[in-house]
């Protein structure tokens, strides 16, 4: 084989591998393309699962078995993406989506902290959505939580309200989300195997976050609100709390590498090894300052920044030292609100000219 042909073949193989990694979690596209409920399909129409793009063979089989789950998986993915964008709105990488089935584009081909967070928050979103759908009677294979009564619950409090079924949500999310990674058979010791192990670890960390933060909720019963009796159940934490928890894990994520036993090990052995609740990554993050088609970085040109902040949202860091443009904009807000009898609030509209700063 000539050197030119060898180079072309290598380039082609590298391109294919990158495309497979970019689309590695393309089930995320369920968040961007609304999933129709199974009952909306008429006789003779194509089955739901054949119309969904981005599913791996294993995920497609699960879709066929649990068609009523798919709309909630899409909702969970959407919840995860929105939370990702909230947590990173003041960072150079702000969890932007692109208009294709990869959802996040080439930025996910790097085994970075950002990829770790994205896998974790998406997996958490599925647990959250499926657990709640069980409680609301939306799914045929689950119902209210069957979690045993907590030992520290006062004896005179009743345990029996319809709780979020976190156990089922965790199990189903593990089966569905991890299916793509587990059905692959990468060569031992390869970069692809290391990345797959990284993805599985971060998927699990996201699921555990939802499970760990779920807590007991109670409702009072009694004459005139005397609360002489309480009924309690298991309830999911607000997903914002889950996002904040996983963001903390992002900040303390462990740098890993593949060892000779084909397991991930921590690069710095002086630190405690990560637990199943921790995020892990393989590659250093790009600086995300400039647009880069290869890494998927969209850059920070045109992003708003805070002139007075010294944090990541400050103009110096957000704009990567390139400077910023200042312009004035008119903001309209409700003001001078008064309660009117009965029963509404009447407000005036106030305009204010404010300075805004945008990265060059």
Curated annotation (Swiss-Prot):
One of its GO terms (cellular component) is extracellular space. It comes from the Eukaryota. Residues 1-16 form the signal peptide. GO terms for molecular function: cytokine activity; frizzled binding. InterPro entries: Wnt, Wnt_C, Wnt_CS. Palmitoleoylation is required for efficient binding to frizzled receptors. Depalmitoleoylation leads to Wnt signaling pathway inhibition. Keywords: Developmental protein, Disulfide bond, Extracellular matrix, Glycoprotein, Lipoprotein, Secreted, Signal, Wnt signaling pathway. The keyword Glycoprotein applies. Glycans are attached at residues 94, 100, 292, 306. The keyword NADP does not apply. GO terms for biological process: canonical Wnt signaling pathway; cell fate commitment; muscle cell differentiation; neuron differentiation; positive regulation of convergent extension involved in gastrulation; positive regulation of non-canonical Wnt signaling pathway. Its main location: secreted. A lipid is attached at residue 224 (O-palmitoleoyl serine). It is found in: Secreted, Extracellular space, Extracellular matrix. Pfam families: wnt. Disulfide bonds join 84-95, 134-142, 144-162, 218-232, 220-227, 289-320, 305-315, 319-359, 335-350, 337-347, 342-343. Belongs to the Wnt family. Ligand for members of the frizzled family of seven transmembrane receptors. Probable developmental protein. May be a signaling molecule which affects the development of discrete regions of tissues. Is likely to signal over only few cell diameters. This is Protein Wnt-5b. It comes from Xenopus laevis (African clawed frog). The lineage of its organism: Eukaryota, Metazoa, Chordata, Craniata, Vertebrata.
